[in-house]
């Protein structure tokens, strides 16, 4: 087989791998998406719970941004359960790690317990602002939100490293989340799918709450 043949074989394999990954992501996304009955439960039975806190602290840190973005995030994080605790140790409605909550609580004078709904929502929205402010390059508001939520889930440093990967390999400009997420598997491995689905789910829940 000549050089041209090897090149075509390589490109063909790369295409098939890309197709398989896209198909796998679609399956995972469908499997992780709640059923219509679960959606009705989340968006009807829990509509009023903690809404005042989401409104208050969204207004404090994000002005006129729709507060339901953070409620959607909390649905994804904890299903709006104030006593939720993940296997990794994240706690409360906004699933903050102990160190993150402790640092923010010390800065803004919150109670030491992360399971207090008001304090946890306050700290979570405050942490979102830190994640948002990390991204200073000019982008649309929607793109900034996606990067904010991705940073909240995976850490801003990991998202920056993913951006560096796609820029170094000339995948794309690295300005849009749809581009940056292509580099995330090179940074966080199998956990990259969790972050990609996380952003999708927050947007999905927000669309259900509107």
Q: Where are the regions a protein language model picked out?
A:
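Short, charged helix-capping/linker segments at alpha-helix termini
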Residues: 58-67, 137, 141
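Non-catalytic cell-wall polysaccharide-engagement segments
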Residues: 2-37, 41-48, 102-103, 107-126, ...
């Amino acid at each position: 087989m000549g050089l041209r043949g090897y090149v075509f074989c390589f490109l063909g394999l790369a295409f098939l791998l890309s197709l398989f990954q896209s198909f796998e992501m679609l399956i995972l996304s469908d499997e992780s998406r709640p059923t219509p009955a679960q959606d009705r439960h989340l968006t009807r039975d829990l509509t009023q719970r903690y809404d005042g806190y989401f409104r208050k602290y969204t207004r404090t840190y994000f002005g006129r941004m729709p507060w339901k973005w953070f409620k959607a995030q909390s649905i994804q994080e904890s299903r709006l359960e104030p006593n939720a605790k993940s296997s990794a140790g994240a706690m409360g409605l906004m699933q903050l790690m102990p160190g993150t909550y402790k640092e923010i609580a010390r800065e803004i004078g919150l109670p030491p317990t992360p399971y207090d709904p008001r304090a946890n929502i306050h700290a979570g929205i405050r942490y979102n602002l830190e994640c948002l402010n990390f991204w200073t390059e000019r982008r649309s508001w929607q793109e900034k939100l996606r990067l904010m939520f991705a940073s909240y889930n995976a850490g801003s440093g990991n998202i920056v490293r993913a951006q560096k990967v796609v820029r170094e390999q000339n995948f794309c400009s690295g300005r849009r989340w749809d581009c940056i997420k292509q580099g995330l598997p090179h940074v966080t491995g199998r956990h990259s799918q969790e972050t990609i689905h996380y952003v999708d789910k927050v947007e999905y829940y927000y669309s259900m709450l509107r």
